[in-house]
Structures are given as C-alpha cells and as structure tokens.
Regions:
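Short helix- or helix-capping micro-motifs
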Residues: 39-42, 145-150, 157, 177, ...
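Transmembrane-helix motifs of polytopic, lipid-linked glycan transferases
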Residues: 40, 112, 116-136, 174, ...
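Short acidic/glycine- and proline-prone juxtamembrane loop motifs at membrane-interface regions
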Residues: 56-57, 81, 154, 160-167
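Transmembrane-lumen/periplasm boundary regions of multi-pass, lipid-linked membrane glycan transferases
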Residues: 67, 81, 87, 219-337, ...
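Transmembrane-helix signature of polytopic, membrane-embedded enzymes
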Residues: 101-105, 129-151, 170, 188-191, ...
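Membrane-interface transmembrane helices that cradle and orient dolichyl/undecaprenyl
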Residues: 134-136, 140, 175-197, 207, ...
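Hydrophobic/aromatic-rich transmembrane helices and adjacent perimembrane loops
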Residues: 158-159, 165-168, 207, 216, ...
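Aromatic/acidic, Gly/Pro-rich catalytic loop(s) in extracytoplasmic/lumenal soluble domains
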Residues: 488-557
C-alpha cells in the first residue's frame, strides 16, 4: 500500500489554518481602499513634525555627503554606505530649497528635507508587506500586517531618521514580492516567470545600493532551496537564468551607486570594516556600558538586545500576537509560507544577534517579519474566539475582524500618544513613559536635543567660548545655524581638549552619549555641578547643559 502525499506547490495556496473567506476577502475595492488609507495615514504619522527633533551625528554625515556631491560631483564622501539614499536626499533637499525660495512664509527645515525620503519609503512599505503576506497567508492576515506596520510607533520612529535601513527593508520587501510572484507564475501558469526573476534581481541590486547587507538575499535563496528537492516543483531557475539574475543585480547596483567605483569609497569602506569609523568606545544598554565593536561577538552588547526591544518597544497587543503565533510557525497547517518567515528569522538572528555591535535601527529589517507573525497570531486568536462564542457562520467572519480592529486601534493610540518622539515609546511591559530612555538611550535620543542645546548656549556664551559634547561636529553645525561660528566645539572624550576648558565654557551631557571614555567626567559633573538648563523630549529629560565655574572646573581637572 502506498502512502499518498500532497505535493508542495506554492506558498500562495491558502493555509488550512485560515480556510474560508473573511470580511474583506471578497471585495478587491475594499482591500484597495483599505491599503490607500493605511499608506496615507502611515505617511501622515511619518512626516508630521519631521523636524521636531534635531539631527543626529549620523544624519549630519548624510547632509554633508549631499553637500559634497553638489559641490564636487560624485565623491567618496560617507563612502562606507552606498549612494542611493543620499541621491534621494539630494533631490529632496534641492526641491525643499526651491520651495523655500518660492514660499518664504512656510519654509521646509533641513531636517525635514533630509528625512523625507526614508519617511516616504517607510509608508510605502506597508503595501509591500501586504503583497508578501497575502501571497503567503491570505488577504486578511496581509491587511492586519500592513496596518500594524503603518501604525507601529517603532516602525514610524525608525522611518523618521535619515538612515539607510528604511531603504534596505523597502527594496528587500519589493524583491520578495516579485520572488514570490515568480514562484506562483512558475507553478500555476504556463506563462514565463522570467520577468519576475529579473525584477527580483533589479530590486536586490537597489537593496545593495541602499545598504551593504547582501546576505539578506540568502533568505530568498533558502526559501527557494526548500522546494528544489521536490520532483513536482516547476520553480527552477537553472544556471543560465541565475547568471542573468546576478548580472542584472550587479548592473542595477552600479547604476544606482556608481560611487562604489571610486578609490576613496573603497578606502572609506576599509576603514569602516576595520572598526576605525566607530567614534565611541561603548554603548549604554539598560544602564550598563558595553563595548560596541562588531568583532567583540558575545563579549559585546548582549545577545538578548533585540529580544528586549521586541518585548518593550512594540504595542502590547502586537507583542501578544507575536508570542501566540510563534508555535504556529512550526505547524504544517499554517502552510508552506511559514518557511519564508522562519528563514527570515533564522538568518537575521545569525547576522545581527551574535555580533558585538548593535543598534536598534538594525531591527528595521526584521520588524516586518515580527509584525507578520503578530498578524498571524491575531487572526488565529480571532478564529479561535469565533469558534467558541458563536455557531453562526456569518458572525464567525466578524469576530476576527473586530479583534484585528482592536489591536490596530491600540497601535494607533500608542503612536498618537508617542508623537512626535516615537523612538521613546515603551509599552506597559517596558514601564511606559516613566522608563523612556532607560533601555536604549543612544538610539532613543539620537542627539535629538543638540539643536536646542546649542540654541540655548548661543544666547548665553561669551565670544570664543568652548562647548564640550560627544557630538562636536553636530554642535558646530548648529552653532553655525545659530550664527555663532565663534564657538569652539570640542569632544568630551578628548582629554587634551577637556584640559583646555576654562571658566565660562560649557558642557553638554546628552542622554545616550555616556561612554567608558567620559563616564567619570559625567559622574563628576552630576555630583559637583548644577546644570543651567535641562532639556526634554516631550516629558522625558534628554540633556543637561553646564556652565563651568571655578568649582566645577577644579573637580574636572
């Protein structure tokens, strides 16, 4: 007697766990309208008050690179990162300048212009999350996942900084939209799937032109590999198509990031790879200092760093949905799309959790997978509740929808309350607002108060006063904007520069900028000096400004 086994064909098959039609599945118009609402509302959260916080030191590097491009053409400025995002930022800044020259009464701040491209691609990512999730798990789960992304305070906060991670995740998602469509075309139609393969390759080229993290491509390859041992599968690229694939990927990368051909770019990448571009010797995590070198591996920032982020930085109901679904990822009834999510988690953990250097912005590339998993958990919980509270078939369709609306509404409320300082959001597990800035102060504050600190000092300081901080280049930039180019901005971690401080000079102690190199000095100021100003982001203390008198100076020296 032979045992019959159903062939694994494509993840696009609806998983048995969610069999049946939901409230929106029968109406393409409603689905389209819902997506438009999610993108527009998500964009609103991401662009409103985009200049409410000052630039970070990292963002200033992007602004300077754009200025260098405009002054000298393509250069190796900020060459450790690819060019695509900076090109978009250059366009945004040029358009903002034209706007400001035309509409003098409503100028666009440099902070807004620089951050706008990442905010836009962040909002558009909701569509890509929907398309991937609908291919894997169905329309209802896809809408929940897209809504969770659109309104998640951490996703919004990460999309509101001018860093490459938002572009990286956008093109990674776009590549896998085409990858999964290619799988469906190969398995279920007689038409050629080649166009989807080439679009996938182009998207991956754009991804690498956004940030040098090519190993994310391994997620798609591992998922593809899962099906290659099955005689029934028609989803096979072959050597020739793979060669064309990588050729397209490489050409698109070169077109979108031609600065990679410059010798200076390779010099900058070499310095970055050797850890010589890391300007500080530590990272504060949960009130403890850790080394921040990638090569420290398990001796650096703890492995559980991103687990803590997941527990405290996502809306509570989204966390519960994620935890509820984790066991489901190992159930066959969830469908073969679960393998894509499992590979996503596995390869991301290997790449990001075991290195010694970590930043919360790296979480951007796994957050869609977390929210998709959460959406699965919410849908499962809704179906489970429906089966227990009603025998009515029609009513059973509405219970999961109502639960999803409750969860999404919770995310909306959290984001409304967190605005415009979304990175400071903590759920009740993390202690809420009272504990904001405790877990990841470097990434939560991200130099946001430096602009206000320099503005305060500019009104007080004598000519030629020194200003010590851990972001001297950023301080100098804002001093120039405040028309105080006479101020001498120095590093708090430079012992020789600190020795030159005199009575009437200033020290800025920003939360998140505590390192091994300045810990003793900051403790001395805290114990023996009184700040002349204390700045806040919303209600959360973010920085202190000290004007040195003879007593404070003697304690420092």
């Amino acid at each position: 007697m032979s045992v019959h086994a159903d062939a694994i064909i494509t993840a696009g098959l609806r998983p048995d766990l969610f069999a049946g039609r939901g409230v929106l599945a029968n109406s393409k118009a409603l689905v389209f309208a819902a997506l438009i609402v999610l993108v527009v509302a998500g964009l609103g959260f991401r662009v409103t008050g985009l200049s409410a916080e000052g630039l970070s030191e990292d963002e200033l590097n992007k602004l300077n690179a754009v200025a260098d491009y405009r002054a000298h053409g393509l250069t190796g400025a900020n060459g450790e990162h690819p060019m695509l995002m900076k090109a978009c930022q250059a366009v945004s800044i040029i358009l903002a300048e034209k706007w400001n020259n035309t509409f003098l009464s409503n100028p666009i701040a440099p902070e807004t212009a620089l951050r706008l491209p990442t905010a836009v691609v962040g909002a558009l990512s909701a569509i890509l999350i929907f398309l991937i999730t609908s291919e894997l798990f169905g329309v209802e789960v896809a809408l929940i996942a897209a809504a969770l992304w659109a309104f998640d305070p951490s996703a919004i906060g990460l999309n509101r900084i001018a860093k490459e991670d938002s572009f990286l995740v956008f093109f990674f998602l776009l590549a896998n939209v085409f990858w999964l469509r290619g799988q469906r075309a190969a398995e279920s139609t007689d038409s050629s799937p080649n166009k989807y393969y080439w679009l996938t390759a182009a998207s991956y080229g754009a991804m690498v032109a956004s940030k040098y993290v090519p190993h994310l491509f391994a997620i798609s390859i591992c998922y593809y590999w899962m099906f290659q041992g099955l005689p029934e599968t028609r989803w096979r690229l072959g050597k020739k198509r793979l060669l064309i694939f990588f050729t397209i990927m490489g050409l698109v990368f070169l077109v979108l990031s031609p600065t990679v051909l410059l010798p200076e770019t390779w010099r900058q990448m070499g310095l970055f790879a050797g850890g010589k571009r890391i300007s500080h010797d530590g990272y504060e995590f949960m009130n403890h200092l850790y080394t921040q070198r990638f090569s420290d591996w398990l001796n650096g920032i703890p492995v559980y760093f991103y687990l803590v982020f997941t527990a405290v930085k996502l809306p509570l109901l989204a966390v519960l949905g994620f935890v509820a679904c984790l066991p489901l990822l190992f159930r066959r009834k969830l469908g073969d799309g679960r393998y894509f999510i499992l590979f996503w988690f596995l390869l991301w953990v290997v790449a990001f959790c075991f290195s010694g250097g970590k930043f919360t912005r790296y979480y951007t590339t796994i957050l869609p997978a977390v929210l998709i998993t959460s959406a699965l958990g919410i849908q499962f919980a809704g179906r489970w509740l429906a089966n227990r509270i009603s025998d009515s078939v029609s009513l059973k369709h509405y219970v999961p929808a109502i639960l999803a609306v409750i969860v999404i509404a919770g995310s909306v409320i959290d984001s409304v309350n967190a605005a415009p300082h979304f990175r400071l959001f903590l759920n009740s597990i993390g202690g809420g607002t009272n504990w904001a800035g405790y877990y990841f102060p470097h990434d939560e504050f991200y130099d946001a108060s430096m602009r206000d600190a320099i503005a305060e000092i500019a009104t007080r300081a004598r000519t030629g006063a020194r200003v010590a901080s851990e972001s001297p280049s950023l301080a100098a930039y804002y001093a120039e904007r405040a028309k105080r180019t006479d101020l001498v901005c120095i590093s708090l971690s430079d012992p020789d520069a600190v020795k030159q401080l005199a009575v009437g000079d200033y020290v800025i102690v920003a939360r998140g900028r505590r390192y091994f190199s300045n810990d003793a000095l900051i403790s001395t100021l805290r114990d023996h000096a009184t700040p002349i100003a204390e700045l806040k982001l919303g209600v959360v203390p973010s920085a202190k400004i000290y004007e040195l008198d003879q007593s404070a100076l003697s304690n420092l020296h």
